[in-house]
Each structure stands twice: as C-alpha cells, then as structure tokens.
Amino acid sequence: GTPAADKNVVVFGSADMNIYGLNASDGRLLWKINTEAPVLGAVTIRNGIAYIGGSDHKFRAIDIKSGTVVWSYDGVEGYIETKPLVYDNLVIFGAWDKNLYALDKKTGKEVWKWHEGKPGRFYSAAAVWPVAANGKVFIADPERALTAIDASTGKTVWRTKESMVRETVGLSEDKRRIYSKTMNDSVVCYSATTDFPEKIWASNVGFGYEHAPSMPVEKEGVVFGSTKNGLMFGLDAHTGKVLWKHKVGNSLISTLVPLSKNKCLFTATGGEIGLLVIDYKTNKHK
C-alpha cells in the first residue's frame, strides 16, 4: 500500500506480512511488525501515530517512533487496501466485507459500522479513500453510488447514482466541494455542504472507460486526476474546465501528489515515477 512519512520515519505495509518503519534519511530499518497476512493497506499518520489495515482482519494504530502497537481492532471481516481517514476523534476506513468502519482513534473502539446497497463484498466501499467535511463522510463504491454519511452516527445523509461514479472521491481545499470520476470520460463535482446531492458541475475529460481507484486531488484551485491508461489531467476546481492533459505510457497512474498547481509527483504501475511540470501560459507540460 501507499506509504506515509512523518518526523523522519517512513511507514508502509508489505505483501511479506510485515509493517515497516524506516529512517527517511538513510532507509535504515527502525522497527518491523509481523502480521498474519499480507499488508496491502495504505498508511495515514497523525500526531505520531500510523493507522493501517491488513489482510489479517485487523486494523492497527502504531507509534511511529517506537514501533509499538498502541491498539488493534480485530472486528474486520475482509481485507483492507484503502488509505484511512482521520476525522475529528475518528479513524474511518472501508474493507472488502461490505462495511465502512469508524473507530475511536485513541482507543480503537468501534463507534459505528456502515453498509448500504447490494449484498456481497464486491460492492464494498473498500478501494476509495474516504474524505470528510462539515460533519459528513463521503465515499464512492462499486455500485456506482456517491454517498454522504453522518460522521457522528454513521447514518446515510444522502446517496445518489445520478452520475455513475466509482470508487474515487476527493475534497476541495475549502472543504465545500467533492469530486469523483465517472466510469466514462467525465469528472463530477458535488456540494459538500448540503444535506442532499447537489451537483455543481460535470466535465467531459475524454478519458474513455475508467475504473482506476486513483483519487482526484485539489491543489491551488486545480483538480488533479489520473486514469488506468496513463493519462493525467488538470481541471478548474470551480468550473470543471479542462486545463491540461498529459499521457505517460499506458499503465495505471496512482493518486497524484500535487506540490503546487504547476507541479505534481506521479507513479505508474508500469514502473514510471516522475515530476510533471505544467506551464499554464504556454499550455506545455513535461
């Protein structure tokens, strides 16, 4: 899964059934935690604590300095691949068992568990990286639904299949809008402030059939996105206007890491890793 770094410590899970903490400066091993199955989940670090889920039906909070497991929740029924969300006093994540979980971030105690829609683990909100704002958690699932959930109670606030989105969601920097890719050509934007599904814009990017769980990310008024076929793109966050498109090979591009509206880091399953630089005046990118 996607690693995270804080206080000169890099934390990541591995298919060899371990969770590692490395010195970010020299790569030296600081600690290692053995689990009972491959660890495919991404990592989120807050206040010196790393949150990560595994395939052994456990979700762990780990002190990144010592490698000590602060708490472990063993109520997960499927494996975890998502990047956990830390919001207020909660840590929130989905698993391939139909459920979205909300745990107390300090104790690991289950606060609520959400599931709605068709039965079966293949419809789980497990690949999406949840986001939250204004007391609501937002997810998109394989049932092609975009959902807002009350962060306090775990009850559904609204749920819509209008735009046929799938497994991607991103939050605007001002926390007033959410973004999601549809399964064909387009990115949509909805309000994050309303108690009903209010679409703000839809943009035809022209990427074709799409199902890659790479999240849209806003930086300095630009929504950065990527696809399963090597395409990266930037949209105006307020209007959806396509600002630029850039292709790197034909493999899946992971969730982009924008450093500014002019620069973003990317990795691809084909092995590519790089820095994309965008000049908005000349519309050139390299």
What is each model feature region?
Residues 20, 60, 101, 147, ...:
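WD40 beta-propeller blade core
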Residues 13, 53, 94, 140, ...:
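Residue-level marker for isolated small/hydroxyl-bearing positions within beta-strands
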Residues 17, 57, 98, 144, ...:
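Repetitive beta-architecture junctions, highlighting loop-to-beta-strand starts
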Residues 23-26, 63-67, 104-108, 150-153, ...:
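Short loop/turn segments that connect beta-strands within beta-propeller blades
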Residues 1-7, 15-16, 28-46, 55, ...:
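Extracytoplasmic beta-rich repeat domains
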Residues 10, 50, 91, 137, ...:
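Hydrophobic beta-strand positions that form the internal "hydrophobic ladder"
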Residues 48, 63, 94, 104, ...:
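Polar/charged low-complexity regions in secreted precursors and cytosolic/nuclear IDRs
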Residues 221, 228-229, 235-238, 247-249, ...:
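Short, loop-centered acidic/histidine patches that primarily coordinate divalent metals
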